Amino acid sequence: MPFITYNGALVGKISKVTANTARITLITDVNFTVGGRIQREESRAIGVVRGRAKEKEFLLMDEIPWDAELAKDDLVVTSGLTSNFPMGIPIGKVIEVKQGDYGLIQQAEVKPFMSLAPIEEVLVITDF
């Protein structure tokens, strides 16, 4: 189940639940992946958004087709192509676009909307 901040930005997913607790995986964790989509009128490019842990403060949007339109400041949202996340949850903003290995794909550095400061309140999406 995804969870979001009070203003709708994706924070992560619940990975384990017990009677009294829930374990979460933050979007910055290296084990976190979600389908992402560029939210712009001229482009609906699809890719995979991955966490990168403490080595980077930004996320990586990978596996974007080489011919997709992509630009700095594009909004990245969940694609809805995986059953665990509904479409349209804000993830972050593109800060840099690069060619992937051999020029077959593009990659984007994404600055998450989620603040890395302590989070006091989240919303859990249980039905979509």
Where are the predicted features?
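A secondary-structure micro-motif
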Residues: 1-128
